[in-house]
Each structure stands twice: as C-alpha cells, then as structure tokens.
Amino acid sequence: MNEELMKTVKLFLLWSFLYFAVGIIGVFLGHICKSEEIMKWTLALGYLLISIVYFGKHYVDLSFGRIERRMVWPAVGMSVLVAVAYMFVSFFVISMLDIYLFMEESESLNKSDPNLFLGIAGILHSCIIIPIVEEIGFRGIFLAGLLKSRCRPWLAILITAIVFALFHMSFVKIISTLGFGIIIGWLYWRTGSIIPGIIIHIVNNSLCIVFAFIDLSIESLAIWWVILVVCLSSLAYGVWWFWKEV
C-alpha cells in the first residue's frame, strides 16, 4: 500500500469514526433529554465542527478546481439541473421498486418522520451540513485520495460510490444512492472540486424534505414516463455540459 493510499485510508477512517460518533451522541442526548431539538442541534453542530476541522487542517481542498472563474455560475446552474433531474429519476425508480419488488421496505422509507426536518436545526443539519460533511468524507478525502494514489478513475469513482451507498443502509436507498455517488464522483474527477457535489447534495436533500410533505404517488404512469424522459434528457445535458466546458 503506497503512502498516499495509506494516508487516505487513515483520514477516511477517522472521518467515519467522527461521523458515526456524532450521530450516536446526538441520538443518545435526544433520547436522554426527550428532545428532538437537542438531537438535531447536536447533530448539526457536531457535523459542522467536523467540516471546520477538515477544511481548517487543509485535508480537503475547497476551491473550484478546474472550473474557470467565468464558468462558476453556469456550473452552479448545471449542478442544480443535474440534482433536480436525478432526484425525479431516482423517485421514479424507487416508486417502480415500491410497486413491483420492495413494497414494504419502500413504504417504511416513505413513512420517515418529517418532523425531524423541521426547525432551524433540522434544516441546517439535513439540507446544508450533512451534504457538506459527506462530500468532505467521500469525495474530498476518499475519492481524491484514490485518484492521487493512481487508482483508475472509474474504479475509484465506483468504489467510492459503493461505500457511499452502503452508508445509507436500505437496499432500496442503495440503488438510487449508488447512481447518485457515481454522478457526483464523476463530477469531482472532471472538475477537481467538491463544490458541484455539495450543491447537488444540498438540492437533493432539500427536495427529499419537500417530498416528505407532499404526495407524489404515481397515479398516471404515462405522465411519469414523460417526466422521466425529460429528466433523463436534462441529466444527460448537464453531464455533457461539464464534459464539454470543464
């Protein structure tokens, strides 16, 4: 194992330990105090502290990488387009799995308590801080380290995406999260920056919260096939844009 890969493994294992430690402490304090607010603030502040430490120690590069200054705002816009398009594609796939294969598990996912996302702490934790801290760990440390250790790009992207998906436990979630990880990993490899991934992750998590409060059940399959085609086309265009412009 070369020195760069060894360093990557150590940093990622440390990040993983801190990530789960904050989660356990947050849930424990929330249970002891019988307060969801305490749990949410503990998680938000804990993950924020991890992010500050990793950025402060320069373990992760927070720059636009190979994205030229004049292309920053177009890149932000394309990141949002990719996020929204993939979210609807993912929703369609999970809904099909719900109907044909994993109805009980998908129903349990859809019944997650939306109150966990409410309030300043809930929004900060779910929509902003979690995307940042996860992009630090998976793309900023793990994928970046694999690429620096001369691992083949597609192998590095796939390995990172698999680990990222396994972090999200449920089999139904793994399917959509694996694709999500591959897209964000490819964008990191293409741009040399975790910023597009952070933007996509923030939009994705924000839409997940919105979807928790509204009914998007598939009543007319024909309409959803049209939406799927539009979103796949938008997703392909976003990826093509990053390939062409960066």
Regions found by a protein language model. Give the residues of each.
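Functionally important transmembrane alpha-helices
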Residues: K173-W225
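Juxtamembrane helix-loop-helix connectors linking adjacent transmembrane helices
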Residues: S63-I130, A144, K148, I218
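Hydrophobic residues within alpha-helical transmembrane segments
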Residues: L14-F17, I129, I159-V163, I199, ...
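N-terminal, membrane-interfacial amphipathic/helix-forming hydrophobic leader that caps
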Residues: M1-V76, V80, V84, S206-V246
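Alpha-helical transmembrane segments and their helix-entry boundary regions
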Residues: T8-F12, A75, A156-I157, I174, ...
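Membrane-interface helix/loop boundary segments of multi-pass membrane proteins
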Residues: V133-I159, W186-S193
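Membrane-helix interface segments
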Residues: E36-E37, M71-W73, G119, R150-L155, ...
